[in-house]
Amino acid sequence: MSRSVLITGGNRGIGLAIARHLAEAGDRVAVTYRSGEPPEGLLAVRCDITDTDQVDAAFKEVEEQHGPVEVLVANAGITKDQLLMRMSEDDFTTVVDTNLTGAFRVTKRASRGMLRAKKGRVVFISSAVALRGESGQANYAASKAGLVGFARSMARELGSRGITFNVVAPGLTETSMSQALSDEQLENLKTQIPLGRLARPEEIAATVAFLASEQAAYITGAVVPVDGGAGMGH
């Protein structure tokens, strides 16, 4: 059955891989993007998830073209890495506002239609860093760890309405972010991963697709690591 799906930050990397995977399975997929080029073959809506009005406008456009959102993947996120003593308050709050509060904004808006339908799937894209920590990423780790508490609270709050909330925690993945690392940095990072390689975006997408499926109807409040064993789920 074709569903209305919305993926935030779905114009590149992991978000785009998820969008392509679900679209190929027959879903009506829309993605939000803040910068860059919109992907071809998908309904792309420009939206800054730190702006509540833009979030509402994006949902209205998706609802008009695809119907109420039945599957939400909160993927949009940013990094502003810096050691604590050099990290400004803006560096911290901007990352939290995008990665955590942004997820709150889109979840709250999506819940309207899901509550009426008495069903829905919400998947948050966190990070292995949220579970194991990382020097220089206190802001990012805090924002991504916050998604776990948020998802589990929502699972308890709205579970009786047939809406599931789960978290996927990817490890280092083959995206533009990892491509910015030097060969030496990559090799050093690989030594910390039991499987000895980076994740492919398609592997993250397959996990999200499962959690959004009927086969996962009895899974909620879960955190699924897709990190090659780097964090072991913690």
Describe each region flagged by the PLM.
Residues 83-84, 88-96, 178, 189:
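Substrate-binding pocket helix/loop in short-chain dehydrogenase/reductase
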Residues 127:
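Residue(s) in the substrate-gating loop at a strand-loop-helix junction
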Residues 132, 209, 220-234:
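Short C-terminal tail/terminal secondary-structure segment
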Residues 193-204, 215:
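A conserved structural motif in NAD(P)-dependent oxidoreductases
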